[in-house]
């Protein structure tokens, strides 16, 4: 039935135990997430994924919102356990009866299996029905005393929490005269560094040109700043990863975004790319040239 080494996580467990938070966490880890797919559709879905060749990690949420799917879920878990899909894992989210009742009362929602609106009866029935699936789970997380943030941390810890390939860095340059980038996490002002704009032969070049780059970098002030700032970034980035961030945008700004910020962004991006996936962009590098051309 399953014939590939795609990474598949079956996310299941008690209703109200945190599957919504789990799905959001898997999305941040780079998983393609599908919520409540009827198990009979999984083989066809799997074939489509395999043909596309673009999806390598899948998180599939299955639960008992419809009791009609129960036998199919158990059979699917049995097949995953017995044969070809060797890279599959089952994550079972659990919580105490008392905590689940409290959560349902807080949200004023009814349990999907509750008869005549009695929440505890629905919980007991669901726990009984899910027992065979829970016994097959490789990872069980009790969310009774976990906040959404703590549950997210547990999922990251168990599923590639320290895989820096899922963490991306955007290093961008910009000009303060055109406004701050609204999506930046870290903004650094480098207008205190020597400005190539005042060197006539460099004015119309950019920080990507060797002459401008060398002019900016030869300053002792630039070198001291660079070493200290990169040291700071290398200190805080592992903390961002541990916190569960999937990306961070570092914005380097000078007056017009043409010289100093471009040169520094290039050097910083190249250094960080030795350890992390990095994308570099220069928001305002060509704006002065475009303005001149329009005039």
Curated annotation (Swiss-Prot):
Pfam families: PapZ_C, RapZ-like_N. Keywords: ATP-binding, GTP-binding, Nucleotide-binding. The keyword GTP-binding applies. GTP binds at residues 63-66. One of its GO terms (molecular function) is ATP binding. ATP binds at residues 13-20. InterPro entries: P-loop_NTPase, RapZ-like, RapZ-like_N, RapZ_C. Gene3D superfamilies: P-loop containing nucleotide triphosphate hydrolases (3.40.50.300). Belongs to the RapZ-like family. Displays ATPase and GTPase activities. This is Nucleotide-binding protein LSL_1171.
């Amino acid at each position: 039935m399953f014939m590939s080494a795609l990474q598949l996580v079956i996310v299941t467990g008690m209703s109200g135990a945190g599957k919504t938070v789990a799905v959001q966490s898997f999305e941040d880890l780079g998983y393609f997430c599908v919520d409540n797919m009827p198990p009979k559709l999984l083989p066809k879905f799997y074939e489509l994924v395999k043909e596309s060749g673009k999806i390598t990690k899948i998180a599939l949420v299955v639960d008992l919102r419809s009791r009609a799917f129960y036998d199919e879920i158990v059979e699917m878990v049995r097949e995953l356990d017995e044969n070809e899909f060797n890279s599959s894992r089952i994550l079972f989210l659990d919580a105490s009866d008392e905590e689940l009742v409290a959560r349902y009362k807080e949200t004023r929602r009814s349990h999907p299996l509750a008869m005549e609106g009695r929440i505890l009866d629905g919980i007991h029935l669901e726990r009984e029905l899910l027992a065979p699936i829970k016994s097959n789970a490789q990872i069980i997380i009790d969310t009774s005393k976990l906040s959404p943030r703590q549950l997210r941390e547990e999922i990251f810890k168990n599923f590639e929490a320290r895989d820096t390939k899922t963490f991306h860095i955007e290093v961008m340059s910009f000009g303060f005269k055109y406004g701050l980038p609204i999506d930046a996490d870290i903004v650094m002002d480098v207008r205190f560094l020597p400005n190539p704009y005042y060197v006539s032969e460099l004015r119309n070049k950019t920080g990507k040109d060797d002459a401008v780059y060398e002019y900016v970098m030869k300053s002792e002030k630039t070198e001291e700043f660079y070493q200290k700032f990169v040291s700071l970034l290398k200190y805080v980035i592992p903390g961002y990863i541990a916190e569960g961030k999937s990306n961070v945008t570092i914005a380097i700004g000078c007056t017009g975004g043409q010289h100093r910020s471009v040169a520094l962004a290039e050097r910083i991006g190249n250094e960080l790319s030795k350890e992390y996936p990095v994308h570099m962009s220069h928001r305002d590098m060509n704006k002065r040239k475009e303005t001149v051309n329009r005039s």
